[in-house]
């Protein structure tokens, strides 16, 4: 096996769940043809997390071999909501919400993928002028029985839960994207398999070569149970501050450390195998490996210097209990005092009042290093508030 074949083999094996059709994809990669690598995203939320990063890293690896990424911004399908893995119909988003989410999503996307080797396309380029006859013609290519073969649809149908007609259209619309951009390969998670294969079918029906499909594993979130998801709060966002990424890495269950190393870092497989052996024999403290993981991630997303500073701050603030030298400030209106619950929300130390109250009840809130539990406590200018293990804000 020559160097090029070895590199391609590594890309198609590590961090990959399934390739359809693997031999055909290998031949394409070795042919010298510049491939169009399709990745679509629905900007239904404004943030990318490590779960998305698994596929994005594959795209970057293939860009480095000279291939072109075609990024589809699903400004139409986002208003429907991808039903993949959903147990209920998702709420529709407004066009304004979708555009706002897409802006921040693209900024984060290019932290991982090479912008100069990426073609960005918006679904509205072809769907803005789609007529009813076009919808009928497209939907006539498939049957309701085919759509209900999806695992998530089948479960909802069997349970008597509603499935909207727009959701049935979703896989066809995603497939039509592949036709419009002449996709050679489409990327996605294993929960997207049905949609990706519909793309192959539709391309063939319309006289194009069917795209290859590369599926990546689903990354388990920091709770160790569910798929990483912002809605579940078990995510590590790629745009979060380095100190926040570092702290969240420390919270992942020990049994997930190796999976994270494999899927979202470039640590050699031989070194990961050594980590596995050391953990199995009690030769390494898992925290040491989590710190290594955090530094690797922050170096990818920011810089080596940012990684070292985040490591040092974690040691000072979390392990030694020191107050950080630099912390966010939250300005009080006219210098007046404010209820601690309201301050926690205003300073973005918690996302909701219920979360803030829960922190108080669990003893997770301090004012000037003194634990408090009374939600009626007030915060005044100069106070330093700590929420959870590592979040601080100064009232000014």
Curated annotation (Swiss-Prot):
Residues 338-396 form the S4 RNA-binding domain. It is an enzyme of class 6 (ligase). Gene3D superfamilies: HUPs, RNA-binding S4 domain, Tyrosyl-Transfer RNA Synthetase. A motif ('HIGH' region) lies at residues 43-52. Its EC number is 6.1.1.1. HAMAP family: Tyr_tRNA_synth_type2. Homodimer. GO terms for cellular component: cytosol. SMART domains: S4 (SM00363). It holds the Pfam family SYY_C-terminal. It comes from the Bacteria. Keywords: Aminoacyl-tRNA synthetase, ATP-binding, Cytoplasm, Ligase, Nucleotide-binding, Protein biosynthesis, RNA-binding. A motif ('KMSKS' region) lies at residues 227-231. This is Tyrosine--tRNA ligase. ATP binds at residue 230. GO terms for biological process: tyrosyl-tRNA aminoacylation. Belongs to the class-I aminoacyl-tRNA synthetase family. TyrS type 2 subfamily. The keyword Transit peptide does not apply. It catalyses: tRNA(Tyr) + L-tyrosine + ATP = L-tyrosyl-tRNA(Tyr) + AMP + diphosphate + H(+). GO terms for molecular function: ATP binding; RNA binding; tyrosine-tRNA ligase activity.
């Amino acid at each position: 096996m020559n160097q090029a074949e070895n590199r391609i083999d590594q890309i198609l094996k590590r961090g990959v769940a399934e390739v359809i059709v693997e031999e055909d994809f290998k031949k394409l990669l070795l042919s010298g043809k510049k491939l169009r690598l399709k990745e679509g995203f629905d900007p239904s939320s404004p943030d990318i997390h490590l779960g998305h990063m698994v596929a994005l890293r594959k795209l970057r690896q293939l860009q480095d071999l000279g291939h072109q990424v075609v990024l589809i911004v699903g400004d139409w399908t986002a208003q429907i909501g991808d039903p993949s893995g959903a147990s209920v119909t998702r709420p529709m988003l407004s066009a304004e919400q979708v555009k706002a989410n897409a802006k921040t999503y693209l900024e984060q996307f290019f932290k991982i993928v090479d912008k100069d080797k990426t073609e960005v396309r918006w679904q509205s380029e072809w769907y803005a002028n789609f007529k009813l006859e076009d919808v009928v013609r497209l939907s006539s290519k498939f049957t309701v029985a085919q759509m209900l073969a999806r695992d998530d649809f089948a479960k909802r149908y069997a349970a008597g839960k509603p499935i909207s007609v727009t959701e049935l259209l979703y896989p066809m619309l995603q497939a039509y994207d592949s036709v419009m951009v002449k996709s050679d390969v489409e990327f996605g998670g294993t929960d997207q398999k049905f949609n990706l294969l519909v793309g192959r079918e539709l391309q063939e029906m319309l006289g194009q070569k069917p795209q290859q499909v590369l599926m990546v594993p689903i990354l388990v979130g920091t709770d160790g149970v569910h798929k990483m998801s912002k809605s579940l709060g078990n995510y590590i966002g790629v745009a979060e501050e380095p100190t926040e990424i570092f702290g969240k890495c420390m919270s992942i269950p020990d049994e997930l450390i190796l999976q994270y190393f494999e899927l979202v870092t470039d640590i050699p497989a031989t070194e990961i195998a050594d980590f596995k052996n050391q953990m199995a024999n009690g030769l390494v403290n898992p925290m040491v490996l989590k710190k290594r993981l955090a530094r690797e991630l922050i170096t990818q997303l920011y810089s080596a210097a940012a990684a070292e500073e985040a490591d040092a701050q974690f040691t000072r603030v979390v392990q030694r209990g020191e107050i950080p030298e630099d912390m966010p400030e939250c300005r009080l209106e006219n210098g007046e005092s404010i209820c601690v619950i309201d301050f926690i929300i205003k300073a973005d130390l918690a996302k909701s009042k219920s979360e803030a109250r829960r922190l108080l009840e669990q003893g997770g809130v301090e004012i000037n290093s003194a634990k408090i539990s009374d939600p009626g406590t007030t915060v005044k200018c100069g106070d330093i508030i700590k929420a959870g293990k590592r979040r601080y804000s100064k009232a000014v």
